[in-house]
């Protein structure tokens, strides 16, 4: 087993003034000029106090500090390489200074790779550089991380596209793999062991492994060479509630999850849940959020482009024919829709369906999902359209908060 020294390139936890148990380093408290400081974009950790305790990578001293740590770590310890975790977390530059510093961060990556290469030569064995970045290549560039250039220049041996928050659905694996064709950089799909709110499945109400399986299979089918599983050592970041809060205890279900994530042949025979994340609260780090949303009015021009989009890289009909897939479900969690039932327009992949669920599923918090059995799903992109007919403004206004596609190979309990 290879062992890597891992560095969190910017940490959000220290930005919370109320998090007294989470310490701040002497370097930060003595050198506030090296931090992002003020102002802080809305929705970012530290915004409540208008001050960010993250490092400002526009500062030469900050970059040199990390490069020195990389060098010292490989000098003092016999690691197999380094992991630089940029998913935890942007921002890395002050507002208005991001674009001009894109080359700065790219040069920092070149310098980091040079350190790893130098230690590989001195130790006469290959050391690897792993780089973890958020899941959206375009969004990464907006944050100062030119992921495309990093891949095309081969600045990392393994490039992980991993969600900064919990497990998400949409990851730019296909794009990254296309950039890596000429240099052999391995692209991994990555996600946290925890998920956002999802319907009860397999006896669990929190973070069921079915979501991880779906995300992993999509990644493999897009060309990923492997899976990077983050935070799974935390019991609170596994399907739960867990039998024990001991970090060192994994029951059979969670061990099986780790084994399943290794290869497509296991994943395609296991239950999977393809879901749209619905983060709540401040400080959320994930992009491309499609829910929650209110239902738009057809009388005001709403149409097919309002559809929610989920990708399912599996041959649904073929899987059913070979007995691998038993059934499929569409699950929706909605609010304030009861008074507008006669106005709801419902389509799946362009086919108009009656808005009559087969049943409901409810968790211990009283949240309820409407279940539609065997909707007309397809391999690849699936669209789910929910609109209100007419032009009249509803009161209350119906909204959808969660959307899930379940591909089931065995009965859920």
Question: Where in this protein do the model-derived segments appear?
Answer:
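Active-site-adjacent "subsite" loops/lids of carbohydrate-active enzymes
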Residues: 2-72, 76, 199-214
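Extracytoplasmic/secreted cell-surface and envelope-processing proteins
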Residues: 13-17, 91-94, 139-141, 168-175, ...
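Active-site neighborhood of glycoside hydrolase catalytic domains
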Residues: 61-186, 211
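Substrate-binding cleft of secreted/luminal carbohydrate-active enzymes
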Residues: 158-168, 204-283
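C-terminal soluble interaction/assembly domains
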Residues: 166-169, 175-176, 180-211, 218, ...
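Beta-strand-rich interaction surfaces with strong enrichment in secreted/lumenal proteins
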Residues: 297-300, 317-318, 372-376
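Extended extracellular/luminal ectodomain segments enriched in beta-structured repeat modules
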Residues: 318-331
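Beta-strand-rich ligand-recognition modules
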Residues: 334-412
């Amino acid at each position: 087993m290879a062992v890597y020294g891992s560095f969190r390139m910017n940490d959000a936890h220290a930005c919370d003034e109320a998090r007294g148990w989470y310490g701040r380093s002497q370097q930060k408290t003595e050198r506030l000029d090296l931090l992002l400081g003020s102002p802080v974009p809305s929705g970012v950790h530290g915004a409540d106090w208008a001050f960010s305790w993250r490092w400002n990578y526009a500062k030469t001293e900050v970059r040199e500090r990390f490069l020195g740590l990389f060098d010292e770590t490989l000098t003092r310890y016999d690691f197999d390489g380094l992991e630089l975790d940029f998913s935890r977390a942007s921002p890395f530059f002050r507002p208005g200074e991001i674009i001009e510093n894109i080359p700065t961060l790219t040069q920092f990556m070149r310098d980091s790779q040079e350190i790893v290469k130098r230690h590989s030569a001195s130790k006469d064995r290959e050391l690897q550089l792993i780089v973890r970045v958020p899941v959206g290549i375009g969004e990464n560039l907006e944050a100062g991380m030119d992921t495309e250039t990093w891949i095309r220049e081969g600045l990392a041996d393994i490039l992980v596209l991993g969600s900064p928050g919990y497990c998400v659905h949409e990851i730019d694996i296909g794009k990254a793999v296309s950039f890596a064709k000429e240099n052999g950089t391995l692209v991994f799909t990555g996600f946290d062991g925890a998920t956002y709110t999802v319907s009860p499945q397999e006896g669990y109400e929190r973070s069921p492994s079915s979501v991880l399986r779906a995300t992993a299979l999509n990644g493999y089918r897009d060309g990923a060479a492997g899976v990077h599983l983050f935070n799974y050592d935390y019991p609170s970041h596994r399907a739960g509630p867990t039998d024990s809060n001991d970090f060192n205890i994994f029951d059979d279900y969670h061990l099986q999850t780790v084994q399943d994530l290794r290869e497509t042949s296991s994943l395609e025979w296991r239950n999977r849940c393809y879901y749209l994340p619905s983060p709540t609260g401040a400080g959320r780090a994930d992009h491309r959020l499609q829910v929650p949303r209110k239902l738009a009015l057809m009388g005001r021009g709403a149409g097919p482009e309002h559809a929610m989009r989920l990708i399912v890289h599996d041959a649904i009909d073929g899987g059913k024919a070979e007995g691998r897939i038993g059934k499929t479900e569409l699950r929706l969690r909605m609010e304030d829709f009861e008074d507008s039932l006669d106005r709801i327009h419902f389509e799946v992949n362009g086919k108009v369906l009656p808005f009559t669920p087969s049943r409901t599923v409810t968790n211990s918090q009283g949240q309820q999902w409407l279940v539609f059995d065997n909707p007309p799903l397809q391999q690849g992109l699936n669209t789910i359209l929910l609109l209100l007919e007419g032009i009249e403004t509803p009161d209350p206004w119906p909204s959808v908060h969660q959307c899930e596609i379940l591909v089931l190979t065995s009965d859920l309990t």
